[in-house]
């Protein structure tokens, strides 16, 4: 899948109005994506009580939001000329943003996950962030967070990137009583397991 086709697929998956039937139709168009999704759903990462044999089964068992999340990840992971570590970095950021949102009682945890994940989309697509975002149906809140660290999601993303760089004076978005080290370690552990299921290399140990 070339970059244009991949971006078009991701844009379809990220539409706010995507429903159960839409998602099944989008995924079923790509045999490789369908196969990889079913293989991943049946992996040890999910440890489901029974084998999933169809896309509809996957949707029923995991729910629309989860299937959309993992299908988007697979589409992003399909680039053959990018290091796996780049996707793993996106997974770590996504999970840490989500964990911070969860700790602060934010309702839109999926939006925080998406913000963290797509913070690497410019590197994955070899183009500027603003150009990529023109093709994606994101809310202005997520666009502002990715471009300028605006709003609550932007502040959380900025804190995650600051921790990544070792700039520990810029962690103001972390909830009181939370340990950045602990949250990052949880994110790395999750990303390691998830990337293994997606066929990526394991994440490096947290420093």
Model feature map: region roles:
Residues 1-207:
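Conserved alpha-helical "signature site"
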């Amino acid at each position: 899948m070339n970059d244009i086709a991949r971006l078009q697929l991701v844009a379809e998956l990220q539409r706010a109005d995507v429903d159960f039937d839409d998602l099944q139709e989008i995924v079923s168009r790509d045999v490789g994506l369908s196969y990889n999704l079913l293989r991943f759903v049946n992996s040890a990462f999910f440890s489901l009580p029974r084998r999933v044999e169809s896309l509809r089964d996957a949707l029923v068992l995991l729910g629309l939001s989860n299937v959309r999340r993992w299908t988007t990840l697979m589409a992003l992971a399909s680039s053959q000329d990018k290091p796996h570590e780049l996707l793993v970095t996106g997974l770590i950021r996504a999970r840490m943003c989500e964990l911070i949102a969860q700790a602060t009682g934010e309702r839109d945890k999926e939006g925080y996950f998406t913000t963290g994940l797509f913070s690497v989309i410019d590197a994955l697509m070899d183009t500027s962030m603003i150009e990529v975002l023109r093709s994606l149906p994101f809310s202005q809140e997520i666009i502002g967070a990715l471009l300028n660290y605006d709003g609550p999601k932007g502040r959380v993303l900025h804190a995650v990137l600051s921790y990544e760089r070792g700039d520990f004076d810029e962690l103001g978005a972390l909830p009181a009583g939370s340990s950045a080290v602990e949250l990052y370690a949880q994110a790395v552990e999750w990303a390691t397991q998830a990337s293994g299921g997606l066929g990526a290399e394991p994440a490096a140990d947290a420093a």
